């Protein structure tokens, strides 16, 4: 009986330690909700064109921005978050998710100091970033639909997610 009792105690002890390990692992991995999931991503092909996601802390590009919202509101983004068109966020074809960028509207001088990349896109020709409806409103191009912008990665803010 003593041997059985010792075996039972050891079994329960090891069972508890495994449960603790799994709980701690889940905390480190994060969740789909409040804490964003970091991922660079694998190469992918859209409409016959290959895209190669990569870490690029020197990213600085001028081009056309567009915005997206109603058709995607409430749907899951490429990194697993729920898209909210009323929050400032963006889609980019190759930057890690999440990354933080500064976006300047070169047509009117308005600036968004911090925009978090949490989705993939745009896949329309000649566009370098797709902004949420809220971000487009803040940058003053909601009615035009597109604007010439400068997108600069913010290295320190982006590294916080790694």
Ranges and model annotations:
Residues 1-2, 64:
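Short linear, low-complexity motifs centered on an aromatic residue
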Residues 16-162:
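Secreted/periplasmic proteins
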Residues 2-10:
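Sec-dependent signal peptide recognition
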């Amino acid at each position: 009986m003593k041997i059985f009792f010792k075996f039972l105690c050891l079994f329960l002890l090891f069972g508890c330690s495994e449960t603790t390990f799994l709980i701690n692992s889940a905390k480190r991995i994060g969740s789909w909700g409040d804490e964003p999931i970091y991922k660079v991503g694998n190469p992918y092909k859209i409409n016959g064109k290959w895209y190669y996601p990569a870490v690029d802390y020197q990213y600085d590009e001028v081009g056309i921005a567009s915005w997206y919202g109603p058709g995607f509101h409430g749907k899951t983004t490429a990194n697993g978050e729920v898209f909210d068109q009323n929050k400032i966020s963006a889609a980019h074809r190759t930057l890690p998710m999440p990354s933080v960028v500064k976006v300047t509207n070169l047509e009117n001088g308005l600036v968004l100091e911090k925009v978090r990349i949490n989705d993939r896109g745009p896949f329309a020709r000649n566009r370098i970033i797709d902004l949420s409806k809220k971000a487009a409103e803040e940058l003053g191009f909601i009615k035009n639909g597109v604007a010439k912008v400068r997108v600069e990665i913010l290295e320190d803010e982006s590294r916080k997610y790694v």
